[in-house]
Amino acid sequence: MRFITKWAVVLLMLFTAACGGPKSGAGLRLPDGDVERGKAAFLELKCNTCHTVSGTEIAAPSKEYAYVRVVVLGGEVRQVKTYGALVTSIINPSHSLAPGYPKEVITKDSQSAMANFNDTMTVRQLIDLVAFLQSRYEFVPPEPATY
């Protein structure tokens, strides 16, 4: 019986180790995208109306959109933005609103103020856009706690 328990623990550890990482998406995995085409899609879809991307020359929204609070994407993060989280934030932006921004600025009628692109964005644009955004995040491990 101990032998079976040990093997069960070993198998569980192997399965757990295989699940994770920045490309995990809880079962969601699209083909690899193209970063440059993703950047082009970001501009074509006018994502820069409300967003800017850390580490790029993409300009912040113009003055005509001054009422919009700019949501910065990319940059240093202490939690890994998974592939699934990026896809979800594009196709269902109300699922998780950007932290640190006043709700009245980023919502309309309790939903995300972000436009719904599900009827206009192609799957190729989605795949490439996610590749572009994921390339702009840099994971910075938190400082170890000292006791």
Region locations from a protein language model:
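Gly/Gly-Pro-rich "capping" loops immediately C-terminal to redox-active cysteine motifs
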Residues: V35, K39, T52-H95, Y101-K103, ...
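Short pre-active-site segment immediately N-terminal to redox-active cysteine/selenocysteine motifs
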Residues: D34, L43-T49, S54, Q125
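C-terminal capping alpha-helices of c-type cytochrome domains
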Residues: T88, D109-Y147
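Generic structural signal for secondary-structure transition and capping sites
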Residues: C47, S94-A98, E138
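Electrostatic cytochrome c docking/interface patches
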Residues: G20-L43, E57, R78-Q79, Y147
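C-terminal motif of bacterial Sec signal peptides marking the signal peptidase cleavage site
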Residues: F15-A18
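Processing junctions and N-termini across compartments
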Residues: M13, A41-E44, K108
